[in-house]
């Protein structure tokens, strides 16, 4: 997430082209031509011993002879010279370099050289970059592109060229167009951080094939998507496609889970990609999800309606007032409804009257206008009239407008006019709906991610007990645990398992069955046979001693015949669970090579195909995220919403998924968990059969997770001056109600000191941003008083670090009636310790000169206090390294 050197890459003041040439079709010629044609307003320095000048620009024979150090260099020479040239650039002090091509054998040496000289690299095997707002075309693309608000980041040169060509035809603009290549150094997460703060960028589109660091990507994407829509197209869904791309991209459902968790939206194919570019370039942000459709034909409107229903879209309902205005304005044969079919004899005037009435209403959030080729309303004329009407209508800025001029030849000019006018336009009704639903789904994702999670009830965990059991099993050489062995581990996290006994032979199995009562189930115990069904290793509803003995002997006999080398550790004996009206589910935890542990929910079966049969989420889960997973499973028909007799307890299943998540987060020894079946009966969830694969683990537990979990280790009990003990802990998403209550106990004066303005009310979005934080990027500690089972927030302090993890902005707020207890100082001391241990160098903040308490506290804590009376602020800076030394 480092931003070091990105300014020199994306906003360079000078550029050197190493290997510039006058020979057409050479890389050095193409790069020089594009840089000069793009209108870059800084010096361009061609470096070549072969020419005195290149395209009229004085050339320099080598890097050492350059009159000054360029911000950016582009290597256009033979790849064999890359390392030597990069070394020279580093010694010259160049900050960034684009490497157009390099074999894999050079990668490590190039990375080491760049690191040694504190230089940033784009590529290798990069098409380059375009930054139209800077007049920069440092790429092979001969296509000039307009200035726009959409940034595009691609890991494929071929896709980049395709999009550039497509965008040129539609006169579509970009803020940045960056081809990453092999991402030897600069990667997508760093660019997301940069573009999130770029004023010229309002939306971001990504084409991805692989990730080098899933944790950094999810963190950066989540941060950026809170302010700007980000759409992703990810290739390599199948193993065959991954082999073709030479990537280890991981499970495709894991990508879906990560993209959704970060608040992004995934587009599925190239057709959707082009629609997404059109949408992000021209469409206004949605205010809601209600769609109004106008058409001059029933069939195109029906196609649009079918596409809308297939994606769970929402059709607007017109008010009676709007309907009456439409009846008065339109011919009698036009039925007033949504979709509104104006009929094939509709003129341009009918379109304009309808548009004017609808734009004055507030019955919808987006308006889709469909036009089929018609003699009554020629395509180009209708488009021109519509553009003028929208341009001059006072309420047009409040509605997202989408146009679909059907046909090819007759509508080509109309679509060009729409593009020039900045109105999104699409070729088909289905494509228009797809584009609309992209923005609806993005908006829904963001809304869901900001909902306040419910507090789970009776959620227990005994991490120490689970760790002890796992370590004992590992010490004994175990690599896989069965239901009997897993039972106490699951119980430590509050999960129910069916009581299980072990029988070494058929006689012992009969004895156990007699003790626990019939009917019973017998299951094979063998570490070498993962799927018991392969040898009919599960026998159910055994009702007598004779049936148990025969079933046990039959299992042993089948194993000897089919798996003579398999180790057999006896049988598991269980009472038969009451399955009447119950539903069988499956919960699996797998380890993905890119995203780490994944939690999968489905109904399973013998042939378990998670790509087709399960929904997937990244841990850690809270109640909201778990509930979304369950609902997603129901909507996608991966699980049923009810059994034959009763509905599925969504809240109960969500709580169980949270318990599974906590177990996986706390216990890195777990490599795989398979609960199958999980019996759902009313509010009871019972694991009937469980397999747990384990292995020793050393290192940072959190590093294996794509999302940093709640840092329990930072919790601390603190005694205040009045002798009261309170808990200092990181803030949680579930704290939103308590935070709102806390703010209500802070005086307006103290809030003014904190926020530099009068604040009447904090919205849910404000509070969600304060409580739903990324622990990798910021930290907020709350001081809480525990009373029975409730918590009361007494004070808050937070620090938000920059992407380079050098500086952090801090703030602290204490309940106004609790001043004088040392609460503010203790919170600040905890924050200082955390930021110093986290590797930050400086802690910065501002307050007002008349906030004497904060100024005095800062001085006591060692801050440098800079009083700026003219500005009306006091700057506070703490050098964390110096404080540690002192």
Curated annotation (Swiss-Prot):
Autoacetylated. Deacetylated by CobB. Keywords: Acetylation, Acyltransferase, Transferase. Its EC number is 2.3.1.-. Residues 487-523 form the ATP-grasp domain. Changing residue 809 to A: Decreases activity at low pH (5-7), but does not change activity at high pH. Gene3D superfamilies: 3.40.630.30, ATP-grasp fold, A domain, ATP-grasp fold, B domain, NAD(P)-binding Rossmann-like Domain, Succinyl-CoA synthetase domains. SMART domains: CoA_binding (SM00881). GO terms for molecular function: ATP binding; identical protein binding; metal ion binding; protein-lysine-acetyltransferase activity. GO terms for cellular component: protein-containing complex. Disruption phenotype: Deletion mutant has decreased resistance to oxidative and heat stress. Mutant responds poorly to glucose. It holds the Pfam family ATP-grasp_5. It catalyses: L-lysyl-[protein] + acetyl-CoA = N(6)-acetyl-L-lysyl-[protein] + CoA + H(+). Residues 726-881 form the N-acetyltransferase domain. Induction: Positively regulated by cAMP-CRP. Up-regulated in the presence of non-PTS carbon sources. According to PubMed:22059728, pka is up-regulated during the stationary phase growth, while according to PubMed:22124017, it is absent from the late exponential and stationary phase cells. One of its GO terms (biological process) is response to heat. It is an enzyme of class 2 (transferase). Catalyzes the acetyl-CoA-dependent acetylation of lysine residues of a large number of target proteins. Acetylates RNase R in exponential phase cells and RNase II. Required for the glucose-dependent acetylation on multiple lysines of alpha, beta and beta' RNAP subunits. Also acetylates acetyl-coenzyme A synthetase (Acs) and the chromosomal replication initiator protein DnaA, and inhibits their activity. Overexpression leads to the acetylation of a large number of additional proteins and inhibits motility. Stable tetramer in solution. Oligomerizes to an octameric form by autoacetylation. In the N-terminal section; belongs to the acetate CoA ligase alpha subunit family. In the central section; belongs to the acetate CoA ligase beta subunit family. This is Peptidyl-lysine N-acetyltransferase PatZ. The lineage of its organism: Bacteria, Pseudomonadati, Pseudomonadota, Gammaproteobacteria, Enterobacterales.
């Amino acid at each position: 997430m480092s931003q070091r050197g990105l300014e020199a890459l994306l906003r360079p003041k000078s550029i050197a082209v190493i290997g510039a040439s006058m020979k057409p079709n050479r890389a050095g010629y193409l790069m020089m031509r594009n840089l000069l044609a793009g209108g870059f307003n800084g010096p361009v320095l061609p470096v070549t011993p072969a020419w005195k000048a290149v395209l009229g620009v004085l050339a320099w024979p080598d890097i050492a002879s350059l009159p000054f150090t360029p911000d950016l260099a582009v290597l256009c020479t033979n790849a064999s010279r890359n390392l030597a040239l990069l070394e020279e650039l580093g010694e010259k002090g160049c900050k960034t370099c684009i490497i157009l091509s390099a074999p894999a054998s050079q990668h490590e040496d190039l990375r080491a050289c760049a690191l040694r000289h504190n230089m940033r690299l784009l590529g290798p095997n990069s098409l380059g970059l375009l930054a139209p707002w800077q007049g920069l075309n440092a790429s092979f693309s001969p296509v000039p592109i307009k200035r726009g608000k959409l940034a595009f980041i691609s890991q494929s040169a071929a896709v980049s060229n395709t999009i550039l060509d497509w965008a040129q035809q539609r006169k579509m603009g970009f803020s940045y167009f960056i081809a990453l290549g092999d991402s030897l150094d600069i990667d997508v997460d760093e660019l997301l951080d940069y573009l999130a703060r770029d004023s010229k960028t309002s939306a971001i589109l990504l084409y991805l094939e692989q990730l080098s660091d899933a944790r950094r990507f999810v963190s950066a994407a989540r941060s950026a998507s809170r302010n700007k829509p980000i759409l992703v197209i990810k290739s390599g869904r199948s193993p065959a496609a991954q082999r073709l791309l030479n990537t280890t991209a991981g499970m495709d459902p894991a990508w879906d889970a990560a993209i959704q968790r970060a608040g992004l939206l995934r587009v599925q194919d190239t057709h959707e990609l082009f629609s997404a570019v059109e949408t992000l370039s021209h469409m206004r942000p949605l205010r809601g999800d209600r769609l109004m459709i106008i058409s001059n034909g029933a069939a195109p409107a029906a196609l649009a309606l079918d596409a809308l229903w297939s994606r769970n879209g929402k059709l607007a309902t017109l008010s009676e007032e709007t309907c009456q205005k439409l009846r008065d304005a339109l011919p009698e044969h036009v039925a007033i409804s949504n979709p509104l079919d104006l009929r094939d004899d509709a003129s341009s005037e009918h379109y304009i009257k309808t548009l004017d009435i609808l734009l004055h209403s507030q019955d919808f959030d987006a308006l889709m206008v469909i036009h089929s080729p018609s003699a009554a309303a020629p395509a180009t004329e209708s488009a021109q009239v519509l553009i003028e009407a929208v341009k001059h209508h006072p309420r047009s800025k409040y509605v997202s407008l989408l146009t679909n001029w059907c046909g090819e030849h007759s509508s080509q000019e109309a679509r060009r006019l729409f593009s020039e006018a900045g109105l999104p336009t699409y070729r088909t009704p289905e494509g228009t709906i797809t584009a609309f639903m992209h923005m609806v789904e993005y908006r829904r994702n963001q809304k869901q991610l900001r909902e306040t999670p419910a507090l789970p009830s009776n959620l227990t965990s005994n991490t120490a007990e689970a760790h002890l059991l796992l370590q004992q099993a590992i010490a004994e050489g175990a690599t896989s645990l069965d239901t009997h062995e897993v039972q106490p581990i699951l119980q430590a996290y509050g999960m129910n398992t069916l009581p299980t006994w072990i029988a070494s032979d058929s006689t012992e199995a009969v004895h156990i069955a007699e003790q626990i009562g019939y009917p019973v189930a017998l299951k094979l115990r063998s570490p070498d046979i993962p799927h018991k069904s392969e040898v009919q290793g599960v026998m159910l509803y055994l009702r007598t001693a004779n049936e148990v003995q025969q079933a046990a002997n039959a299992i042993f006999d089948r194993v000897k015949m089919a798996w003579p080398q398999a180790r057999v550790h006896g049988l598991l004996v269980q009472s038969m669970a009451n399955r009447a009206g119950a539903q069988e589910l499956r919960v699996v935890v797998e380890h993905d090579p890119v995203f780490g542990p994944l939690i999968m929910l489905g109904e399973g079966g013998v042939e378990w195909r998670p790509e087709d049969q399960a929904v997937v989420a990244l841990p850690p889960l809270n109640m909201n995220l778990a509930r979304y997973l369950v609902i997603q499973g129901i909507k996608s028909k991966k699980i049923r919403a009810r059994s034959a007799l009763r509905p599925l307890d969504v809240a109960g299943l969500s709580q169980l998924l949270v318990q599974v998540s906590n177990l996986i987060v706390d216990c890195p020894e777990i490599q795989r968990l398979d609960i199958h079946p999980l019996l759902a009966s009313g509010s009871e969830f019972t694991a009937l059969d469980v397999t747990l694969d384990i292995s020793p683990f050393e290192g940072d537990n959190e590093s294996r997770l794509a999302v940093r979990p709640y840092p329990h280790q930072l919790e601390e009990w603190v005694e205040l001056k009045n002798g009261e003990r309170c808990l200092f802990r990181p803030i949680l998403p579930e704290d939103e109600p308590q935070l709102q209550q806390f703010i209500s106990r802070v005086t307006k004066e103290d809030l003014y000191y904190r926020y530099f303005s009068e604040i009447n009310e904090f919205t849910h979005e404000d509070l969600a941003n304060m409580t739903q934080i990324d622990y990798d990027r910021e930290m907020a500690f709350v001081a809480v008083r525990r009373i029975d089972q409730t918590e009361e927030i007494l004070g808050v302090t937070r620090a938000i670090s920059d992407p380079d993890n050098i500086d952090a902005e801090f703030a602290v707020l204490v309940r106004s009636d609790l001043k004088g207890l040392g609460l503010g100082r203790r919170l600040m001391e905890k924050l200082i310790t955390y930021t110093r241990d986290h590797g930050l160098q400086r802690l910065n903040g501002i307050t007002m000169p008349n906030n004497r308490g904060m100024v005095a506290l800062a001085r006591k804590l060692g801050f440098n206090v800079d009083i700026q009376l003219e500005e009306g602020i006091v700057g506070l800076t703490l050098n964390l390294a110096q404080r540690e030394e002192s």
